[in-house]
């Protein structure tokens, strides 16, 4: 018997690393279904957000069995620089998936000041996780990636395969050039 009908996990997953994997594994143990809210889901690429929402979905699902994949749902959250509008967007997208009278929770880790959004959903039961994988940050992982390295100790196998394939793309080369120039603008 699960504690929740749905657990929501919000993140950018740029890229999907072991702490993300561990969080979803815990969510799958505690909830019948897991809703992954992919942040920064607008169809733009830049050095902070190199992967589109559809690519992140594939990267994430590549790390789970078919049985677990069937229990994972995605919603795409567009960046809105207004907390109230952003919260409304998240709730609206989640509510489109859940069944009425469902017990919904929010799973996450307060890693730093950027995690304040976890407190914006008081109607959802908070499942606060202690530090996972030493509070991994994707920023140095992306930087290494743009330098041509994949920190294999940070990523599950499905992510490693995705990153290796993506490295062969023209888009990766364009992002790598933007990184070297410290150009944070979107790819055109």
Swiss-Prot record:
It catalyses: beta-nicotinamide D-ribonucleotide + ATP + H(+) = diphosphate + NAD(+); nicotinate beta-D-ribonucleotide + ATP + H(+) = deamido-NAD(+) + diphosphate. GO terms for biological process: NAD biosynthetic process. The keyword Amino-acid biosynthesis does not apply. It is an enzyme of class 2 (transferase). Pathway: Cofactor biosynthesis; NAD(+) biosynthesis; NAD(+) from nicotinamide D-ribonucleotide: step 1/1; Cofactor biosynthesis; NAD(+) biosynthesis; deamido-NAD(+) from nicotinate D-ribonucleotide: step 1/1. Keywords: ATP-binding, NAD, Nucleotide-binding, Nucleotidyltransferase, Pyridine nucleotide biosynthesis, Transferase. GO terms for molecular function: ATP binding; nicotinamide-nucleotide adenylyltransferase activity; nicotinate-nucleotide adenylyltransferase activity. Its EC number is 2.7.7.1, 2.7.7.18. It holds the Pfam family CTP_transf_like. Disruption phenotype: Essential, cannot be deleted. Deletion of the gene could be accomplished only with complementation by another NaMNAT or NMNAT encoding gene. CDD domains: NMNAT_Nudix. Dual substrate specificity enzyme that catalyzes the formation of NAD(+) from nicotinamide mononucleotide (NMN) and the formation of deamido-NAD(+) (NaAD) from nicotinate mononucleotide (NaMN). Shows nearly identical catalytic efficiency for both physiological substrates. Plays an essential role in all three routes of NAD biogenesis, de novo synthesis as well as the deamidating and nondeamidating salvage pathways. Belongs to the archaeal NMN adenylyltransferase family. Identified as an attractive target for the development of novel antibiotics against pathogenic strains of A.baumannii. PANTHER family: BIFUNCTIONAL NMN ADENYLYLTRANSFERASE_NUDIX HYDROLASE, PHOSPHOPANTETHEINE ADENYLYLTRANSFERASE. This is Nicotinamide/nicotinic acid mononucleotide adenylyltransferase. It comes from Acinetobacter baylyi (strain ATCC 33305 / BD413 / ADP1). The gene is nadM.
């Amino acid at each position: 018997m699960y504690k929740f009908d749905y657990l929501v996990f919000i993140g950018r997953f740029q890229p999907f690393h072991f702490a993300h994997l561990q969080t979803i594994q815990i969510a799958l143990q505690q909830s019948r279904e897991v809703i992954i809210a992919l942040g920064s889901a607008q169809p733009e690429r830049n050095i902070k957000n190199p992967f589109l929402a559809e690519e992140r979905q594939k990267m994430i699902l590549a790390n789970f069995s078919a049985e677990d994949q069937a229990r994972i749902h995605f919603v795409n959250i567009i960046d809105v620089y207004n907390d109230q509008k952003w919260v409304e967007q998240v709730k609206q997208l989640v509510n489109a998936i859940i069944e009425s009278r469902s017990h919904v929770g929010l799973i996450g880790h307060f890693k730093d000041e950027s995690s304040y959004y976890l407190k914006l959903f008081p109607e959802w039961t908070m499942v606060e996780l202690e530090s996972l994988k030493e509070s991994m940050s994707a920023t140095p992982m992306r930087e290494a990636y743009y330098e041509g390295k994949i920190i294999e100790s940070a990523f599950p196998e499905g992510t490693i395969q995705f990153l290796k394939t993506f490295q062969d793309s023209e888009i990766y080369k364009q992002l790598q050039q933007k990184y070297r120039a410290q150009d944070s603008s979107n790819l055109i």
